[in-house]
Every structure is written in structure tokens, then in C-alpha cells.
Amino acid sequence: MKHNDIKDLLSRPEEYFCKDVTVCGWIRSYRDSKNMAFIALNDGTTLPHLQVVIDKSVIPEMPDGATRVGSSVKIEGMAVKSLNANQAIEVNAKTVTLLGDCPLDYPIQKAKTSLDYLRTLPHLRVRTNTFNAIFRVRSKLSFAIHRFFQERGYLYVHTPIITGSDCEGAGKIFKVTTIGYDPKYKSEAEYNADDFFGQSAGLTVSGQLEGEVMATAFGKIYTFGPTFRAENSNTTRHAAEFWQIEPEVAFAEIDDIIEIATEFIKYIINAVLNECPDEINLFDKFYEKGLREKLKKVVDDEFARVDYTEAIEILKKSGKDFVYPVEWGCDLQTEHERYLTDVVYNRPVFVVNYPKDLKSFYMKQNPDGKTVAATDLLVPGVGEIIGCSEREADTEKLLQAIKDRGMKMSDYQNYLDLRKYGTVPHSGFGLGLERILMYATGMGNIRDTIIFPRAKDELR
């Protein structure tokens, strides 16, 4: 049916004053008085609602159900200047048509409902202001990511979802099979040989290895797609399925990729600030006071940089009684990351030169033989959002790293060939979309940044 988008009315009110319009949407609230009634209507095109005025001398009786929160309606009327200071335009209704009734047991009628409760209703929570705003920001953020790379000449590539190798070498892979359990198979090798691919297969944990293939032909590429990790991590920062951005750049060393990552983060955060003002206002008011200023600091301030070894010394001298003890060689936990970002630096910080045993096999070894040219970008309130590294270009060192981790050499032969035929220094990083979305919105749980979150014992 033909109708006007509420976004158009609210953003360009002068074009619609004293004109007949038709709007469709869902009732967010209904207020009644003796002679007048007021509907807050939202059609999903924008976060703010449109006020519709019902003059009871014009519409003496509303259709049954057309006053209930959640019901969908079509309203025809005239757009006029609003007396409401918060909105320039409103609609004086001439007719109201019920499109879809919403019964009284609608579970999200209350204006304020806890996030914990809404997580039990993933199919309905997107209708609330909070989740409407989250996924609007997610959309803008996604397009800003593409825009950043496209403006700089990167090739967008699609990497496989089903893979035969574990990019991270950690064994946290969801297996893909067409057989299921069958006691006739006496070994894993026999089972895999009879399966669809004739070998073990799983969902991708990263598109990086394939991304490196493309970077050796096109120079600058990026991937942006779903990633899967079978990690039994029931935390507010981990999900089994998430979207990841992974650029790969030929002829780039670690300092080059840090510079690219810095420019990238500033660009996409600035896009959110400029393109989502209503949404940021909502998050600033209800979820993280000072959010807008925090994001402006990201855009305007320099990022800090600290060597892993120095970071360990800072943590050891802090006097803090950390749950996880701090020693050189330990993996930084959330409490350590938050202390560095929130207390020591009060801004994003790159921690560089991690111990090689903490990082993936493909990262370039530093001359000291103990650390790798790798860095994590930590941000206040969230912790790690980006992992960067220069890739190991030395075939012998790469072979040894694969052996040391007990990985199957044949799975990585194509990857090793990249070093054999015209290898170059190259680097890349990975950013989880949901992590940066948490940071940009002030959300404290990654499950609130995904429409249908996937985690341990959670598949709705």
C-alpha cells in the first residue's frame, strides 16, 4: 500500500505541512483524554515516533484494537506544525484503519523492560526503542566499514564458510558432517573418509588464510562475514557466531597495519556519531552517561601504545589484587585490559609484541625469538576489539610453528606455497563487529548486539 515514511515527515517537515499524508506503523503508546487522543506511531524507518492526533469530533470511535500497544495501523490525515517542542510535525488523523491487532498479553508493553527479560524474546525485542537503535547503528556501522575500505582501493572478497583447516590452530571448530553418529566407524579417519568432503570439515573461525591468498594477488583486500567459534565461554563478550572484518595488506609491516587500524576505528566511530545522533542520544541517556564524549575522544585523541612486557610491569606494580595473577607470559584477562584502558591510559591502547606462545602460528617472530609482531587494540569498557599482526614470511619458521602446535601439515600446504612463490611482508587485522558495536552503543553484553545470538546452550 502506498504510504509516507515517518522518517521523511520528521526530517523534512516543511515539505509536508498542510498536505494529506498516509502513514503506517505500530502503536508505541496511546494517550486518551475527553476530546482528544494521541498515538505515538513508529514504522521502523527512524528511531523517533510520530505523534498522531485523534480529534474525537472527527473520529468519535476508534476501531477495536487500534488503541493497543503493538497493534499496526494505517492512518490518513493532514500533516501540520506540532505544538510539541520535541517535534516539528504531527498528523491530524482523518481515518484510522486497523491492520493487525495486538492482544493484551503482548509481552513488551511496558515502557521500560529489563535487557535480561528481552533476551528471552529475541523475535520481539527489536520492536523496542533500545534494540531498534542498536540494529540501526549496526547497519550504519556496517556500511561505514565497507565505505572505508572501498574509498581506499581495497578489494572486497568472500571467503569460504566451510573449511578444512583451523586458521587459529586452537581447535575451536564447529564440525560439519552429513553422517552423524554411527558406531560402524572404528576411527575418525574412516569416518571422515566416508563423509561428504572425504575429510574433516568445519565452519570457519577466520577468513584470514584465504584473505592472504587474495592479498598476494590484489595487494589490499578485506573480508566481512560470519565467523564461528566453538568456545565454551559463557561471558558477556563472547558469542559462538559473530561477524568479523579482516583486511589483509601486502607490503605492510606491523607499524603500517597499526596505522591502518587506527584510521579505520576513527573513521567508523565518526560515522556513527554523524549518522546516528538520535540513537547515540538514547544510549547516552539510558545506558552509558558520557557515551558521546567518549566516542568523540576516540576520533580526536591519539591512541596509546605500550609493549606487552611494559604492560605486565605496570599491572604488577599497580597494587591491584587481580583475580588472575600477572606474570610475563600470561594472557591478558578482561580485568587486566580494563585496568590499562580505564585507569592507566583512559583511552584506546595498542599492546604490542606479545609472547609467541600466546598468539597464532602465522604471526611473525621478532628477533628476540620469544615474542611476535602482534598487537591487540584495547578500548575502555570492552577490552580487546582488534587483533593485528605482521604475518610470518619465513617458511622455515612457519613450518616450525605448525609442528610445535601439533597441527596437520597437509592442511596448510597451500598457505605454505604463498611463502614459496614470491612472498612479501604482509599484515592484517581482525575486528569483531559486535565488539565495536558494544563500544559504540554502551551495551554491556554481546548478546544484545546480535539479532539471534548463538552461544553455549543458546540456539533460539
Give the positions of each predicted feature:
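Generic non-transmembrane alpha-helical segments
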Residues: 144-152, 264-275
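A translation/RNA-centric and nucleic-acid-associated enzymatic feature enriched
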Residues: 162, 172-270, 281-460
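Class II aminoacyl-tRNA synthetase-like tRNA-binding/catalytic domains
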Residues: 2-246, 250
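Residue-level recognition of alpha-helix termini/interfacial anchor residues
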Residues: 12, 276-279
